[in-house]
């Protein structure tokens, strides 16, 4: 055999066989010598070998003829058999109802370009079948922590991969040193992989544009090498051991646009990154040991997003005043941040997070931020002046959680574009009067607003979709709710004085209802009117004894009556043909006949029965059907 053969190729690099550079293993697999990663193990079948020898040309021709015949057979087929591939990946124990099968079906519809197997680690056993997907460009194996290294090495044979996600898997230094085989890779994520200590091998990925190594806490080598990747535009090293020395390895004239160093506690000085004029997104949240170089932030003229949450030495916005292109700014939990002077120059800001800035007392400087759409001032304990709020005419989202000094809802009545409002923990609010002008409001949170006594002012909010009400101890009547005809989700918790729940039964469009720790809730006869209900949670409502109309809720997918200790009847439970999740924990008053009806629920997947008297015969039948029991 002379020159390059036209009838065979190496199973690893997919290059045609060349005489003199091949080895034949006893398992009859042939590879280029340089492609054999482990010296005494076959990369294809992982069989251990006792010796290696040069491939015989005549035997190669015989193997190649068989290979070509197999290729002709495959070419004549209509495509890859999803069922067969699913069984191979799952070691033969996978059915057509498995998650692997569903993911493969989705990939087939996309012409096998994208395959997402994240979270399928409990089913995946053998990745060898992936070699048939030669067109695969995007693969996600995140959370598949049970796959051994020899299985993960199969991924390196998919030479057309552009994007690869391997979060929280068993990849290690050996895998990283071999990844250079993926010549076209542009996106790589190996977050949370504790076996990685040296990332020097990643520098062979000359086409790489985005790299994420978040939470790879054991990395000690290679930070300086990856910073030299010529095409790298996005680098994320959150919760790693990056130091000031590693920061100095980043070339100021590089192409980096996104840089994330959140919770890197070894970083103390930001001076080294001051020359990176190309940066558009920078995250330093949780880097609480930074004491130097904050003045360098003003040099990032192209910066669009900045997160310096938790910076203990940031006291004023003056160092940020030149970032005129900034659209997103987060300085949350900067305990010493007091002075907002300088923010008024950031006229392009869309989103501002000041939550947990205990020193902020006035919002006067935000009045000029006419483009602001989202503002979070939760937990600003010293805030007493809200004069700037009424001028934010484009504001759509406002979080005022735990701002105890906020008492007058009328101060925001002119914010007509408001879509989401969180007033949780504003315990001095006594009335919702003023909210009726926010006609576009879609989500409202009123948790811990203990002085509110009525919903009457918000009855006209027809666009409201989600309402959270918790620990409103003085709320006795739900009148006004019936007018919110567009409400889809209602969460009512700990309203112990409330006695009139009738308005809830008029919410014909509601899909999710949660009523927990409502001590006076007894009569649920109106439930039958909520025909579109998909999720119902009745938690800790001890006065409920029968629920005789539950069988009429044909669209119900999730039902929870946990810790309703006096519940004795669930009428029509067997008619809930769409029910997928059922929680009867702590319902010790239910009879055996109720539990027997569980065997008639065809779509049941999860059952919670802790603290209930569930017959053994029911548990055995549910286990046989593959129901997850807790």
Swiss-Prot record:
GO terms for biological process: cAMP biosynthetic process. GO terms for molecular function: DNA binding; zinc ion binding. Gene3D superfamilies: Ribonuclease Inhibitor (3.80.10.10), Zinc/RING finger domain, C3HC4 (zinc finger) (3.30.40.10). Keywords: cAMP biosynthesis, DNA-binding, Leucine-rich repeat, Metal-binding, Repeat, Zinc, Zinc-finger. PROSITE patterns: ZF_RING_1, ZF_RING_2. LRR repeats lie at residues 184-206, 207-230, 231-251, 255-277, 278-301, 302-324, 325-347, 348-370, 371-393, 394-416, 417-439, 440-462, 463-485, 486-508, 509-531, 532-554, 555-577, 578-599. May interact with adenylate cyclase to regulate its activity. This is Putative adenylate cyclase regulatory protein. It comes from Trypanosoma equiperdum.
